[in-house]
UniProtKB/Swiss-Prot annotation:
GO terms for cellular component: chromatin; growth cone; nucleus; protein-containing complex. GO terms for biological process: axon guidance; dopaminergic neuron differentiation; forebrain development; midbrain development; positive regulation of DNA-templated transcription; positive regulation of embryonic development; positive regulation of gastrulation; positive regulation of transcription by RNA polymerase II. The keyword DNA-binding applies. Changing R90S: In MCOPS5; does not affect the expression or nuclear localization of the protein but inhibits its DNA-binding activity as well as its transactivation capability; the protein is non-functional. It comes from Homo sapiens. Transcription factor probably involved in the development of the brain and the sense organs. Can bind to the bicoid/BCD target sequence (BTS): 5'-TCTAATCCC-3'. SUPFAM superfamilies: Homeodomain-like. It is linked to Microphthalmia, syndromic, 5: Patients manifest unilateral or bilateral microphthalmia/clinical anophthalmia and variable additional features including pituitary dysfunction, coloboma, microcornea, cataract, retinal dystrophy, hypoplasia or agenesis of the optic nerve, agenesis of the corpus callosum, developmental delay, joint laxity, hypotonia, and seizures. Microphthalmia is a disorder of eye formation, ranging from small size of a single eye to complete bilateral absence of ocular tissues (anophthalmia). Pituitary hormone deficiency, combined, 6: Combined pituitary hormone deficiency is defined as the impaired production of growth hormone and one or more of the other five anterior pituitary hormones. CPHD6 patients manifest neonatal hypoglycemia, and deficiencies of growth hormone, thyroid-stimulating hormone, luteinizing hormone, follicle stimulating hormone and adrenocorticotropic hormone. Residues 123-132 have a biased composition (Polar residues). This is Homeobox protein OTX2. It is found in: Nucleus. Changing P134R: In CPHD6; uncertain significance; loss of transcriptional activity, when tested on bicoid binding sites; decreases transactivation mediated by the wild-type protein, when tested on bicoid binding sites; no effect on DNA-binding. Residues 38-97 bind DNA. Keywords: Developmental protein, Disease variant, DNA-binding, Homeobox, Microphthalmia, Nucleus. The lineage of its organism: Eukaryota, Metazoa, Chordata, Craniata, Vertebrata.
Amino acid sequence: MMSYLKQPPYAVNGLSLTTSGMDLLHPSVGYPATPRKQRRERTTFTRAQLDVLEALFAKTRYPDIFMREEVALKINLPESRVQVWFKNRRAKCRQQQQQQQNGGQNKVRPAKKKTSPAREVSSESGTSGQFTPPSSTSVPTIASSSAPVSIWSPASISPLSDPLSTSSSCMQRSYPMTYTQASGYSQGYAGSTSYFGGMDCGSYLTPMHHQLPGPGATLSPMGTNAVTSHLNQSPASLSTQGYGASSLGFNSTTDCLDYKDQTASWKLNFNADCLDYKDQTSSWKFQVL
């Protein structure tokens, strides 16, 4: 009895059973060694089988079950082998495409690196070429503005013999402005341009010089030899006037401008076709044509 109790207690549902007892109860149940994975034999395709598979792959990369079974019957292989072959063939095709793309990028990238400096140089040369003409043209303007004597020489004003050229506006100012530090703003008159064209009062009007105040700032001198041949100037036109911040200096003729008082403001008596001066003490009133 005691020996029976000393035996392993079988009534505990086998939890406390030893391996010997387990082997006695279930001799067939044993834990085998590392289970060996079943390997498939490598399928070797013949040339004829590969030709049939390649022909179908050229038509479609994803054949359905019916097409795979039909090809499997032709080449005498199971359908699963045909499916695996198409799977491997698609992977191989993708790998080849990636290699071609990577190889093409590796070949193109050095070419881009080589051509990029040339493009930068060409772009820099292009931009410098674009900015070169303004710089070259600005040099003559500075030189001409620094020498007002050459601008106002009779030779440069001689082409202005015909002030009455065809023009649409009465008060159109067609002479450019060039800046000099010595004489404020000086007008560089272009040849064969009209001052006030299309009106009868054009022969009496002379260009008005907008003068800025400053130490030694005077009106730019004009050659009297070329001007007096067409315009009769009064002593007031040859005199230089320096006014305040918003003053005007005029080169006028006795037929058009009447200088009343040197200390007072200017009074302009223009032809009725162009300007009408209503009140001397009030502001200017212009009659628009």
